[in-house]
C-alpha cells in the first residue's frame, strides 16, 4: 500500500475506476510552453514573462510572427496527439470533456466549442500560427531552427531542447483563459 501511496494522486486517477486501481503511472508527462527568450527580446517582450493568458499569447504571437511567414509566433501541433492539445485548451476554458462516470461527453458544450474556435483562430484570424496541419514530429525541430518562437509540447522534450537549442529558452505553464490547466499524458502499467 505504501508503494501505491508514493505516486502523485492526480497521476493515479486515470488508472482507477469504481474505486479500484487498475493501472499505475508510467512515462507520464504534461504539455508545457517552450519559448525562445532571444526571440522575445528581439520582439521587445520581457523574456522572463511568458504569456500567462490567451490574450497575452495572441498579443505576443503578433509581435513574434514575421510578416513573410519565415517565423511564426507560436505552434500547437495538430497531429500525433491533437486530443491532448484540445484537452489542454478545454481545461483552460474551464470545460471538462467527459462526465466523471465516463458515460457522457461534452464536445458540443460552449466551453469546448469556444476552445476549438480559439485554436483555429490562432492561424485563421490572428495569423500567429500556420493554418492547417502542424506536425507533432517536426515541431520540435521547427522550434530549434527558430521557425517558431513558442511551441506547446511534452515535458518529454526538455532534454532534447536543452541539449540542442542554440538560443536562450524558457519553459512555462500553458496560458489560461478562465483558469490554468494541462492534462497529463503518457501511459499506465
Per-region residue spans from a language model:
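Hydrophobic residues within well-ordered alpha-helices
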Residues: 57, 64, 87, 141-146, ...
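A local structural motif
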Residues: 44-50, 102-104, 120-133, 147, ...
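Hinge/lid segment of periplasmic solute-binding proteins
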Residues: 1-32, 58, 85, 170-172
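Extracytoplasmic "Venus flytrap"/periplasmic binding protein-like
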Residues: 1-10, 14-16, 42-44, 49-52, ...
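Ligand-binding "clamshell"
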Residues: 18, 70, 92, 161-177
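Beta->alpha turn/N-cap motifs
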Residues: 136, 153-158, 175, 187
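Glycine-centered hinge/linker elements that transmit conformational signals in sensory
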Residues: 58-63, 102-132, 174
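Short, solvent-exposed loop/beta-turn-alpha elements that line the ligand-binding surface or hinge
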Residues: 1-7, 50, 73, 95-116, ...
Amino acid at each position: 500500500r505504501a508503494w501505491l501511496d508514493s505516486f502523485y494522486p492526480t497521476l493515479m486517477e486515470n488508472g482507477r475506476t469504481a474505486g479500484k486501481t487498475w493501472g499505475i503511472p508510467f512515462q507520464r508527462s504534461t504539455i508545457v510552453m517552450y519559448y525562445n527568450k532571444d526571440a522575445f527580446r528581439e520582439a521587445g517582450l520581457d523574456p522572463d514573462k511568458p504569456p500567462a493568458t490567451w490574450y497575452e499569447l495572441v498579443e505576443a504571437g503578433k509581435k513574434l510572427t514575421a510578416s513573410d511567414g519565415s517565423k511564426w509566433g507560436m505552434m500547437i501541433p495538430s497531429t500525433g496527439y491533437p486530443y491532448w492539445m484540445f484537452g489542454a485548451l478545454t481545461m483552460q476554458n474551464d470545460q471538462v470533456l467527459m462526465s466523471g462516470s465516463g458515460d457522457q461527453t461534452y464536445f458540443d458544450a460552449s466551453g469546448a466549442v469556444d476552445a476549438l474556435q480559439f485554436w483555429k483562430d490562432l492561424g485563421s484570424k490572428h495569423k500567429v500560427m500556420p493554418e492547417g496541419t502542424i506536425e507533432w514530429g517536426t515541431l520540435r525541430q521547427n522550434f530549434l531552427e527558430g521557425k517558431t518562437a513558442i511551441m506547446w509540447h511534452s515535458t518529454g522534450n526538455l532534454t532534447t531542447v536543452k541539449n540542442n537549442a542554440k538560443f536562450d529558452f524558457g519553459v512555462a505553464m500553458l496560458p489560461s483563459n478562465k483558469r490554468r490547466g494541462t492534462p497529463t499524458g503518457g501511459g499506465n502499467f
